[in-house]
Amino acid sequence: MRHFISVNQLEADEMYQIIRKANELRDRPNQLNRQLFAGNLFFEPSTRTKMSFSVAERKLGVEILDFHTEASSLAKGESLYDTAKTFEAIGANFLVIRHPSDQWISELEQGGKLNIPVINAGSGKEEHPTQCLLDLLTMYQEFGSIKGLKVVIAGDIKHSRVAKSNAMALTKLGAKVIFSAAPGFEDHTLDYPYLTMDEAIEEADVLMLLRIQHERHLHKAETSDYLSLYGLTKERYKKLQDHAILMHPAPINRGVEIDTNLVESEKSRIFKQMSNGVYVRMAIIMHVLSEWGIIHENNLIKRKSLTAI
């Protein structure tokens, strides 16, 4: 594995290996017995992804080299590649990068030779592989397998990196992917069937809602009647199958794609997804560092629990 940029890099058995490792880490956390440094380079706002990577790194015993774009040499015209090489030069063992560009990885690769692994924490509208794997873990915990599930992804498909990553991975694992989107929010470059929300509700084993990505629209989308036409209302929620679960990558626009009272409903696994994100990212970091030969099995020790004084 060169850098971890896309879920398409992983075979089905590797995906299951990572989500099973993440599941194991919830109960039996590991720590690394050697000093490692992570450079977290976030060029877009982030709450869940940035914080869960930070917690994952700390749980593994990794030192975090934090980065603030507004106080960095990027303001002086430094390239992404030179910034990454700087982190490598001062001792970072791996980088976690989120960037608004769809092509930032190409910029890194064309810049020269980077000798440490990069983990994609979200690339423009293209991919969000770590979010995808935590979503897969959440489904795996619920159903024991991904194969055969009908997963409806509903919302702003056109601008969603989550939709793309999940659709690819779910298909590889044998699930049936169905999209549902308001007019103008479809992405017809992705070859999946579309249903209306009312049709999709009755099909779904998993209903994954997406917010409208206003920051990627040229003009602000009108949302006053979005919930009633395309979102999850209380009436639609009642039509979900008994075993169906509700997911959302967040941030959530309450009252737009979902009725606010449904965010923590019985079927909702939204906050469980967030919790799973820490352990999936721990597993991904371990997987990537192992692939690069940076860590080995003998570098893992059982994490000591902290005793309150």
From Swiss-Prot:
Binding site for carbamoyl phosphate: R48, T49, R98, H128, Q131, A250, P251
Binding site for L-aspartate: K76, R161, R211
Keyword Signal on entry: no
Cysteine pairings via disulfide bonds: none
Pathway in which this enzyme or protein is active: Pyrimidine metabolism; UMP biosynthesis via de novo pathway; (S)-dihydroorotate from bicarbonate: step 2/3
InterPro entries hit by this protein: Asp/Orn_carbamoyltranf_P-bd, Asp/Orn_carbamoylTrfase, Asp/Orn_carbamoylTrfase_sf, Asp_carbamoyltransf, Asp_carbamoyltransf_Asp/Orn-bd
Description of how the protein assembles with itself and partners: Heterododecamer (2C3:3R2) of six catalytic PyrB chains organized as two trimers (C3), and six regulatory PyrI chains organized as three dimers (R2).
Protein name, as recorded: Aspartate carbamoyltransferase catalytic subunit
Species of the source: Oceanobacillus iheyensis (strain DSM 14371 / CIP 107618 / JCM 11309 / KCTC 3954 / HTE831)
Designated gene of the protein: pyrB
